[in-house]
Regions:
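Catalytic loop of the DD-peptidase/beta-lactamase superfamily, centered on the K-T-G motif
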Residues: 1-145
Length: 145
């Protein structure tokens, strides 16, 4: 099955069918990163940073995961998972999500007031994000120090 085919893009697949650009993806989360109460109340945004599902081994992904309501939280599985793409390392109070096959990474970080969007042109073989995406996230945080 070719997830990069135009026919697949037109299929409107809910869980994996988001088609956008990186700037728009980051812009979507900007009000949450700024946490000014514009889109959601400050209390609701604060709740998005709190873990409510943390698994030692996720039944689908087969490695540890950490989720809030609707978002992924920091997941550093480098010492627990063999292979590339088993981690999503973001700030302590940041929340976001990755795309299927390592195709995207987005997060909002209310501590730094930064939103981040990254997209690839094609799907890869990673579970969460690819090394390039993680390097960009790491460099973003270094620039904020």
């Amino acid at each position: 099955y070719d997830y990069n085919a135009k026919e697949t893009y037109r299929a409107e697949l809910g869980a994996i069918g988001g088609i956008t650009d990186a700037r728009s993806l980051a812009k979507l989360l900007t009000p949450l990163a700024q946490n000014n109460g514009e889109l959601l109340s400050r209390n609701t945004v604060n709740e998005l940073s709190k873990s409510n599902i943390k698994t030692p081994i996720d039944n689908m992904l087969l490695f540890p995961t950490n989720f809030s309501n609707g978002f992924m939280l920091n997941m550093d599985n480098r010492s627990k998972f063999e292979g590339e793409g088993g981690s999503f390392m973001i700030g302590h109070n940041a929340f976001g999500h990755v795309g299927y096959g390592g195709s995207s990474a987005t997060f909002a970080d209310p501590n730094t007031k930064v939103s981040f969007g990254y997209l690839t042109n094609k799907l890869g073989g990673e579970y969460l994000i690819n090394e390039r995406a993680q390097n960009l996230i790491d460099e973003t945080y270094k620039c904020l120090k």
